[in-house]
Amino acid sequence: MRQVCSFKREFAGKELKIDIGKVAWQATGAALVQYGETTVLVTVVASEDKKEDVDFFPLTVEYVERLYAAGKIPGGFFKREGKPTEPEILFARLIDRPLRPLFAKDFRNEVQVIVTVLSYDHENSTDIPSIIGASCAIILAGLPFKGPIGAVRIGWDGNEWYINPPVTLSNSLLLDLVVAGTKDAVLMIEGDGKEVPEDIFLEGIIKAHSAMLDVINFQEEILSQINPAPFNYDPFVVDERLKRAVLDYVTVDQIRDAIFTPSKSERQKALEDLKKKVIEHFKPIYGEITAQVDEIINQEAKKILSQVVLEEKRRVDGRKLNEIRPVSCEVGVLKRVHGSALFQRGETQVLSVVTLGAGEEQIIESVIESEPKRYIHHYNFPPFSVGEAKPLRGPKRREIGHGALAERALLPLIPKEEEFPYTIRVVSEVLSSNGSTSMASVCGSSLSLMDAGVPIKTHVAGVAMGLIKEGDRFEVLTDIQGLEDALGGMDFKIAGTRNGITAVQLDIKVDGLSYEIIERTLKQAKEARYQILDIMEKTIPQPRPEISPYAPRIMVLEINPSKIGDLIGPSGKNIKKIIEETHTTINIKPEGLVYISAPDQESAEKAAQMVQDYTRDIKEGDIFLGKVIRVTDYGAFVEILPGKIGLLHISKYKTTGTGKNQTREEINLGDEILIKVDSIDSSGRISLTRKDL
């Protein structure tokens, strides 16, 4: 007999409802979560057997938006949702981040979490109910998980704090964060700010953590009533006999020498050679032991790293704990692109390239409404950047996530369309990777934007912070490299200007962070950011005064909205003529803004003049140089502006002489003559005159 239960709780002023046992009966665990009128179904399925010979926990999180949830029909020919969109991938990564560190370290069974958006009320975002639902479904499945966890979105508008603010308020917020955690610590932080000071940022995290405690208690009440059976699994355990044998065969000093090798590639080779040596020696005795040897060597390397940091206060590359790697910057490295920069920090190297376009905003199909994107950042991580040979299969989730993070870091500095009417695309190519490539992309983007002449008011820099923790002892590491990321407990990416933070993302491998750790991390990151900004500002202190000669020219005109029809013309005749004659692209906004994109300044100016001619108001007394397009017995029809034709009656021709000697001028087809507007009748018909000219 299935147990069907429904639980309700007020959460941040709205009803949170969780239904258990109502749907998805074949899943290991499932929760139907409704917040406001936004509804998500979260399912968890765990395989019965552990995955052999893997040195990681095989967790997959999928977030799926059904467009019917927002009353939409998918675009395209098939009218059906396809592969995951960028927002879906970013939401999946967001949900994954606080879940992963809380699973038991000896749990190696495959787990798949699927979040399906069923209803969206255009007010309550789907991210918070998704994280809460995932936590609830996992604990009710009985999986070895140190939950439950809570999550809130917190916003600050400069005066007030908002817990789970409505989506409609997001554009007015100076700080917008998603924070997840347990009762005792913070697990995940992700969000953006408009140059928010560190003390405000920390205050927001503390308020968010306090607000989520109620929803954690709510899940504990549900758990106590349901009382699910624990999930039986075969734990991954290192064979103690093998461990002793390995550490007798390979000394701690050999492992220490390997991780203290200065170069990343040499360090990796030294560690891999050690592992191969051990596997070849013990495989005939113990059989397949690759995963176990990886675990043994990695745990010993982690112990050595912790000892060096916590006891000796130094790092494997000789740096102090709060020291950044050597930084170098170069701009204008590619001659025909619109802007470029090469940013290098230690062995991490990123090339960022800017392209300026017109009217090419990115439209994203999602249940959550979003404005077309004028600023786009793409991040590429080719295999050669880590010395590997792999097939290229398009951007992976990590690349999409890193690209979005670096995009958010620069977004508050991007000028409004009225100030700079270009669509801006930055592509960051990772040429060499030894940690913190996403933050190097932030720095490279900032440099390349200034090189392109994009009027950002100041530079943005980013740095990744790490953590070594044993019990209550901890040290925060500034500007972590790959080894410190792999063996450490935290990857806290923080980007911003001298005025404050613009974007953050926290990944952890420990059970959570205290406020003390977060506060120290923010302080060290600020110091490091200032050092990096010093170097960037010396390279290019402000945007170039002119954009690249190879970039398109854009002019913006403002016309009376009532004149849009005149500009377009019958069946688009007028606008087509401008485009064909000037080789430009023209975009007309309903409010009367006309965007002209041209290959050069001359074409832009010619198109602008034609737009002004088509939309100009004609008044009595105006004088034009017109062209005669038809001659009749009673006068001539003269085009005074494109599409604007008036009648010059023969009585209004210019005359010479007086009395019987008076003669009327001769006007022929094709003549260009100076003409004056004599009158305009109520129907808009124009009468012209040549007299008194």
Curated annotation (Swiss-Prot):
<dbReference type="GO" id="GO:0000175">
    <property type="term" value="F:3'-5'-RNA exonuclease activity"/>
</dbReference>
<keyword id="KW-0963">Cytoplasm</keyword>
<dbReference type="InterPro" id="IPR027408">
    <property type="entry name" value="PNPase/RNase_PH_dom_sf"/>
</dbReference>
<keyword id="KW-0808">Transferase</keyword>
<comment type="similarity">
    <text>Belongs to the polyribonucleotide nucleotidyltransferase family.</text>
</comment>
<keyword id="KW-0479">Metal-binding</keyword>
<dbReference type="InterPro" id="IPR036456">
    <property type="entry name" value="PNPase_PH_RNA-bd_sf"/>
</dbReference>
<dbReference type="InterPro" id="IPR004087">
    <property type="entry name" value="KH_dom"/>
</dbReference>
<dbReference type="GO" id="GO:0005829">
    <property type="term" value="C:cytosol"/>
</dbReference>
<dbReference type="InterPro" id="IPR012162">
    <property type="entry name" value="PNPase"/>
</dbReference>
<keyword id="KW-0460">Magnesium</keyword>
<dbReference type="InterPro" id="IPR012340">
    <property type="entry name" value="NA-bd_OB-fold"/>
</dbReference>
<protein>
    <recommendedName>
        <fullName>Polyribonucleotide nucleotidyltransferase</fullName>
        <ecNumber>2.7.7.8</ecNumber>
    </recommendedName>
</protein>
<dbReference type="InterPro" id="IPR036345">
    <property type="entry name" value="ExoRNase_PH_dom2_sf"/>
</dbReference>
<dbReference type="InterPro" id="IPR001247">
    <property type="entry name" value="ExoRNase_PH_dom1"/>
</dbReference>
<dbReference type="InterPro" id="IPR036612">
    <property type="entry name" value="KH_dom_type_1_sf"/>
</dbReference>
<dbReference type="InterPro" id="IPR004088">
    <property type="entry name" value="KH_dom_type_1"/>
</dbReference>
<dbReference type="InterPro" id="IPR003029">
    <property type="entry name" value="S1_domain"/>
</dbReference>
<dbReference type="InterPro" id="IPR020568">
    <property type="entry name" value="Ribosomal_Su5_D2-typ_SF"/>
</dbReference>
<keyword id="KW-0694">RNA-binding</keyword>
<comment type="function">
    <text>Involved in mRNA degradation. Catalyzes the phosphorolysis of single-stranded polyribonucleotides processively in the 3'- to 5'-direction.</text>
</comment>
<dbReference type="Pfam" id="PF00575">
    <property type="entry name" value="S1"/>
</dbReference>
<dbReference type="GO" id="GO:0000287">
    <property type="term" value="F:magnesium ion binding"/>
</dbReference>
<dbReference type="Pfam" id="PF01138">
    <property type="entry name" value="RNase_PH"/>
</dbReference>
<dbReference type="Pfam" id="PF03725">
    <property type="entry name" value="RNase_PH_C"/>
</dbReference>
<dbReference type="Pfam" id="PF00013">
    <property type="entry name" value="KH_1"/>
</dbReference>
<feature type="binding site">
    <location>
        <position position="491"/>
    </location>
    <ligand>
        <name>Mg(2+)</name>
    </ligand>
</feature>
<dbReference type="GO" id="GO:0004654">
    <property type="term" value="F:polyribonucleotide nucleotidyltransferase activity"/>
</dbReference>
<feature type="domain" description="KH">
    <location>
        <begin position="552"/>
        <end position="611"/>
    </location>
</feature>
<dbReference type="GO" id="GO:0006402">
    <property type="term" value="P:mRNA catabolic process"/>
</dbReference>
<keyword id="KW-0548">Nucleotidyltransferase</keyword>
<dbReference type="InterPro" id="IPR015848">
    <property type="entry name" value="PNPase_PH_RNA-bd_bac/org-type"/>
</dbReference>
<feature type="binding site">
    <location>
        <position position="485"/>
    </location>
    <ligand>
        <name>Mg(2+)</name>
    </ligand>
</feature>
<dbReference type="GO" id="GO:0006396">
    <property type="term" value="P:RNA processing"/>
</dbReference>
<dbReference type="InterPro" id="IPR015847">
    <property type="entry name" value="ExoRNase_PH_dom2"/>
</dbReference>
<feature type="domain" description="S1 motif">
    <location>
        <begin position="621"/>
        <end position="691"/>
    </location>
</feature>
<dbReference type="Pfam" id="PF03726">
    <property type="entry name" value="PNPase"/>
</dbReference>
<dbReference type="GO" id="GO:0003723">
    <property type="term" value="F:RNA binding"/>
</dbReference>
